[in-house]
Design a protein with these regions (language model features):
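Conserved beta-strand/loop element in small beta-rich adapter and peptidoglycan-binding domains
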Residues: 46-71, 138-199
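Bacterial N-terminal signal peptides that target proteins for export
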Residues: 1-8
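C-terminal motif of bacterial Sec signal peptides marking the signal peptidase cleavage site
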Residues: 15-17
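Hydrophilic extracytoplasmic domains
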Residues: 305-374
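Short beta-strand elements that form the blades of beta-propeller/WD-repeat-like
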Residues: 271-288, 330-340
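Boundary regions of SH3-family modules and the immediately adjacent low-complexity/disordered segments
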Residues: 19-28, 32, 36, 70-123, ...
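Short, structured beta-strand/loop micro-motifs enriched in basic residues and often containing a Trp
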Residues: 32-42, 125-137
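Short alpha-helical segments in extracytoplasmic peptidoglycan/chitin-binding modules
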Residues: 37, 51-54, 60, 79-80, ...
Length: 374
């Protein structure tokens, strides 16, 4: 009788395991530029099939195996079935695959700003994580690691409280399974460095990515890893303030700031631009500080092949997104500005050309902003 009970318990465990395995079965997409499906998780396993970024695989099961370099840590592996002619089955490191539910979450994130034109373009200074949320206090929201030099469109940005666990860590690179976390920089700085107010908040960019860079169409990137890719046509017109957003005023607004080309759109043909500027400050950044504090419209004379200042606003308080509307010479742009009462208002600026073909801006009355002292 006892043997029968043990057999029943054993069978129940088997069926429970099969049920769990079936529930976890799903699909995933390869995020690594290239990866190998292997015969096993062993170091000496054979390579069965090379898969590339964007390839879809069926996930059959997962397991954690000791890292060969550190037995105190484990690496997660997935047993997958490829969609090749031979339907190859084998094992692949989990970090090389994005699960389908994560990809769906990224698509929903992209849908939130589907009608928003890119506000700027950026490029990674170093390899960095692409996350579902603007939070680097843990690894659960990491979708994939982007390569250094990856380019993307910037849709928006925000500041969030800096995690206490990363007060001294100024990067966002999740370690490969089995490796140590990036070491924190020493907090005992040299006495000859000036004492600056400590930043309690950190900047994050919401980005839109082309398929060749990431299967996930959108995500969040830690701001210190990002270099703004200011177009070569306007980069030399900065006058003490940073260019934080820009859009072309000639051509189709939908074509603005495409980062699918190398160097994130740095090279661009001459033209007219809407540029949003922001003053620099040595004071800590607040969570609700404005995105920009001045509007700069740069015109372009095709005959002389020279740029000129069509409009420069007084100091103001503005927030993204900026939207360019219309076609041809009948265009305008809309910005979210704060009025004298502190209320937010969508403000429209009309564009026109005078008899000589010079670009002009019909600017509404906008409340000037009190400049913050540096």
């Amino acid at each position: 009788m006892r043997q029968v009970k043990l057999l029943l318990i054993f069978l129940a465990l088997i069926f429970a395991g099969c049920s769990t395995l079936a529930q976890r079965s799903s699909t995933g997409v390869v995020v690594a530029r290239r990866a190998q499906i292997r015969s096993s998780t062993a170091v000496v396993a054979a390579d069965l099939l090379q898969v590339n970024r964007g390839d879809v695989v069926d996930i059959l099961e997962s397991t954690d195996v000791p890292d060969p370099n550190d037995n105190t840590r484990k690496e997660r592996w997935l047993r997958v079935k490829a969609h090749d002619e031979d339907t190859t089955e084998g094992w692949i490191e989990a970090r090389n695959v994005m699960l389908d539910d994560v990809l769906e979450a990224a698509k929903k994130l992209a849908a939130e700003d589907a009608n928003v034109t890119a506000q700027a373009s950026g490029q990674l200074r170093a390899s960095s994580n692409l996350r579902l949320t603007a939070d680097r206090s843990g690894n659960d929201n990491i979708m994939m690691r982007l390569d250094s030099g990856s380019t993307f469109d910037i849709i928006s940005w925000k500041r969030v409280p800096k995690p206490k666990s990363s007060e001294s860590i100024e990067t966002d690179v999740a370690p490969k399974a089995g490796s140590a976390q990036p070491g924190a920089r020493s907090s005992n700085r040299q006495g000859d460095e000036p004492n600056e107010p400590e930043e309690t908040n950190e900047l994050w960019y919401k980005v839109r990515l082309p398929p060749e860079i990431s299967p996930a169409p959108a995500g969040w990137i830690y701001g210190k890893q990002v270099e703004l890719a200011v177009p070569s046509d306007i980069i030399f017109y900065r006058t003490g303030r940073e260019f934080v957003a820009w859009q072309r005023l000639d051509g189709d607004p939908k074509d603005n700031n495409s980062s699918t080309e190398k160097d994130g759109g740095r090279e661009s043909k001459p033209g007219s631009w809407l540029i949003l500027e922001k003053s620099s400050s040595n004071q800590p950044h607040s969570l609700d500080e404005p995105d920009f504090d001045r509007i700069y419209v740069l015109g372009y004379d095709k005959r002389s092949q020279e740029h000129y200042t069509a409009y420069r606003s007084p100091d103001l308080t503005g927030y993204l997104p900026a939207k360019v509307e219309g076609r041809g010479d009948d265009k305008s742009f809309v910005l979210r500005l704060q009025d004298e009462s502190g209320a937010m208002k969508d403000t429209q600026y009309s564009l026109y050309k005078d008899a000589r073909g010079v670009l002009k801006v019909n600017a509404p009355n906008v409340a000037p902003r009190e400049r913050r002292r540096k």
